[in-house]
Structures are given as structure tokens and as C-alpha cells.
């Protein structure tokens, strides 16, 4: 393995909007896309895309968002994945409102990654 990434994986819901909402307003999304995100998963994916071998340590909840990102985590890291499933946890997720010029507004829920303790990590990954 060339690089080990430890941290958040999340389900992202991206919505293309004409402008971000102001308080007490409802706006329409022009287009939506679901994807896998989170700092650690995004960095690991970029590293692997550049030809590196990436390992990933992250956590998900036993929920639908966790099921969504599990396959992406396995694709990114393969056998170099330590994926903690926290039965009472909630998987990290973000709603990202993107304007046509690329400006964005992110609402993020951190999920259960903070429930992982150093003693749980595998010595060899």
C-alpha cells in the first residue's frame, strides 16, 4: 500500500440550483446526483485514480446510506479496507447545493466515525 487514508466516507446528494436558498425559502433543484464523498474516501479515490494503492479506514452506520457507500469503499480500497459498521450509528451524509458557476453550499452530518477507537484498528491492513 502506498498511502492509508483514515476518516469519513459519506453519501452525498448534489443538487444543481439556480441560487442558494435564503432562510424560510423553498427552491427547486434542476438536477440531482447521488455520489460517495467524504474527505478520506475522496482523497483515497483520487490517489488510486492517479495510480497509487490506497487503503481506507472508515465507519458507516447500519443504514441505507451505509449500504450505498459500502460498495464504493470496497472499490476504492479492496482488501486494504477496514470498514467499521456501527449498528446504532448513522452514516455520514451531505446535501450539496451547487450553482451553475460552481459555487456550493454544503450541509453535513458527521455520522459515526467518531465512534471508532484506536484499539479497534488492525495492525496490518
Regions found by a protein language model. Give the residues of each.
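Glycine-rich phosphate/adenosyl-contacting loop at the front of the ribokinase-like
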Residues: 1-59, 64-68
Amino acid at each position: 500500500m502506498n498511502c492509508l487514508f483514515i476518516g469519513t466516507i459519506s453519501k452525498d446528494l448534489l443538487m444543481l440550483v439556480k441560487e442558494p436558498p435564503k432562510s424560510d425559502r423553498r427552491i427547486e433543484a434542476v438536477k440531482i446526483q447521488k455520489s460517495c464523498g467524504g474527505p478520506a474516501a475522496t482523497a483515497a479515490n483520487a490517489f488510486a485514480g492517479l495510480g497509487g494503492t490506497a487503503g481506507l479506514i472508515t465507519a458507516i452506520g447500519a443504514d441505507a446510506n451505509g449500504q450505498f457507500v459500502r460498495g464504493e469503499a470496497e472499490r476504492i480500497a479492496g482488501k486494504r479496507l477496514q470498514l467499521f459498521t456501527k449498528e446504532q450509528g448513522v452514516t455520514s451524509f451531505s446535501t450539496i447545493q451547487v450553482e451553475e458557476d460552481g459555487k456550493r453550499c454544503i450541509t453535513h452530518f458527521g455520522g459515526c466515525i467518531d465512534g471508532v477507537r484506536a484499539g479497534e484498528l488492525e495492525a496490518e491492513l
